[in-house]
Amino acid sequence: MIKAIVGRKLQMSQIFAEDGTAVPITLIQAGPCTVTQVKTPERDGYSALQIGFGSRKPKNVNKPMKGHLDKVGKGYFEVLREIRMENASDHEVGEDLAADVFEIGERIDVIGTTKGKGYAGTIKRWGFQRGPSGHGSKNIREPGSTGNATFPGRVIKGKKMPGQKGNKRTTVMNLRIIDVRPEENLLIVKGAVPGSQNGIVLIRKTNRAK
């Protein structure tokens, strides 16, 4: 059975444990999703499911996508995601998926796009230490040296420098499911997940749980 679903980050909140400890939680709208394509090793070279989530107006869908989704017959979706899995042929096109693909206590990975912070310096982006701020110093927030000398004569790849902060695909691993409410398409997860409110996330069962 599939152990992944597309959803939407709703908001963060907190609940209180029996000992009074405040536990941070994230509410995720998990589904409903629809299977839009079943890929098999014989035809496609690998086994996977393509699932759709959300809705989109017909005027915002191009002709190739309309032709693809008209075969499903359940409207047009906001996003499509492909999930590799064994025995994908056990599912059918048009099948609906809900939050009950997960259970309370399961560990999951949540994949999303982090909040974009724009162009940022090394202090905000990487946590660099500031330079001296007194006695005529002029390098309070400068990054400092970026290389060596004649050798190697270049800036090494991966050097931490100013640039775009955030707006990147990120995976938060091994989060625990606190509650599952299939009738509300709701997952309650302990901890934070990447992205802003109403951001699209992919939830999958982790393979890193201890």
UniProtKB/Swiss-Prot annotation:
Biased composition (Basic residues): 156-167
Organism superkingdom: Bacteria
Keywords: Ribonucleoprotein, Ribosomal protein, RNA-binding, rRNA-binding
GO biological process, one term: translation
InterPro entries: Ribosomal_uL3, Ribosomal_uL3_bac/org-type, Ribosomal_uL3_CS, Transl_B-barrel_sf
Cellular component GO terms, alphabetical: cytosolic large ribosomal subunit
MF (Gene Ontology): rRNA binding; structural constituent of ribosome
UniProt-annotated stretches for the region Disordered: 126-167
Family: Belongs to the universal ribosomal protein uL3 family.
Task performed by this protein: One of the primary rRNA binding proteins, it binds directly near the 3'-end of the 23S rRNA, where it nucleates assembly of the 50S subunit.
Subunit structure comment from the entry: Part of the 50S ribosomal subunit. Forms a cluster with proteins L14 and L19.
Record's protein name: Large ribosomal subunit protein uL3
Organism, as annotated: Syntrophobacter fumaroxidans (strain DSM 10017 / MPOB)
Gene: rplC
